[in-house]
Curated annotation (Swiss-Prot):
The keyword Lyase does not apply. The lineage of its organism: Eukaryota, Metazoa, Spiralia, Lophotrochozoa, Mollusca. Its cofactor is Cu(2+). It is found in: Secreted. This is Tyrosinase-like protein 2. Its main location: secreted. GO terms for molecular function: metal ion binding; oxidoreductase activity. Its EC number is 1.14.18.-.
Amino acid sequence: MNTMALFGKVILLQFLIGVGFCMLMQDPKRNDTKSTYATCFRSQPQGNEPASPDCVKAFMAYAEDMKNIFHFTKEQINYLWSLERETQSLFHNHRRRKRQAVFLPVRKECRLLSEFERQNLFYTIRSLKMDTSNPNEYDTLANLHRGAVQPHAHDGSNFLGWHRVYLMYYERALRRIRGDVTLCFWDTTMDFNLGMDNWEYTAVFSSDFFGNRRGQVITGPFRDWPLPPGLTESDYLYRNMTRGRGMPFDSRAASSIFYNPNTIIHSTVTWEGFGFDTITNSQGQTRNITIEGEHNNVHNWVGGAMEFLDPAPQDPVFFFHHCYIDYVWERFREKMRRYFRDPTTDYPGHGNETLHDANYPMIGFEWFRNIDGYSDYFIQNVYRYESPTCQACYYSPYTVCGQGNQCIARMNYPGTEIEEGPQVPNSPVVAFSVAGGTMLMSAFNGRGFIATSNSE
């Protein structure tokens, strides 16, 4: 069988798997069970009081879902349940307290962390991954982002809330190792402002930060990072930063999201919404500004494992990137409040009409409803963000204060020796084609991320 025929069969099989999964997820009886599970988890009996038969049935159905959809073992399901119990206790305490927490962990830009803070965080992430206990906790959390979540947590309104909850679980897992760690965010507008010719020389892809930008990652805290068998063609974490393929988060898009008074409801910044602001690049190509679309560009820019849905969270850069996406969303929510809009109730419902419905239980976090991801609970009781300032950037060895009081990344200067790892073959499933400056999805399951524009 020739290569093209084989590829066609792979794409057809992936499409059929995706359709079958959607049919399973939208089964009315299953949805009733999921709703019961969410209700039961919110009102679990205290002490030795037995759960109701309906709740026992719902818990068993949830465990079966996690086994069938994510292929989790009993140990992995129990681990995730333990994280759910921790987050549930946080929510119960929040309801009793009903006051905003005074001292919250602060998520900062990664380059503005102190040396101690950065090394502490990176070491903790490595410890989570390299732990040899059963199950591997990092891999279990990464597997929550496998192909099954595609129609539920991407391409629609639930993208923002689902990933906010996902980050919270990841951060809770890290704090089990070191209670004083807090995630940082990677503000790629700082790298965008270097100019396209210099993007690949950003100093975050060095041994002090994320490691090398191309090939197998052999430098930095995430070097020699094993990938689960069969996930990619590589046994270890790899990247493939290539000019003209993806881009950092456009600082013009960020400015529009933060300040444009014409985009003050979620529909104007979410996938499949309306009323978008636009950007026109130097080739005259125009694209809509959405948070998810700009996010996709960064996945393509980093490349390698980050470029595909299933292995993306295996690169720790995934979580720093998504922490920035969450920061961008919170800045947008602040703008909404300035214009007397309530971000907790403004749920647009774009995307798959069932899976992105406001009251549909979140896949993987099924005691949350989708709209719960839009709650103010997180920013009031779990963490807060600290915006980069020129004063802080001035004192960091990794940033400078540029024109217009904008923080700009420092570079590994062109022409200097930048270590690169062994090259890794492309994934056997081709996920993109390029037409007119736009990357188009050509596979449903195991897909890559759509880039709204690959040229500037």
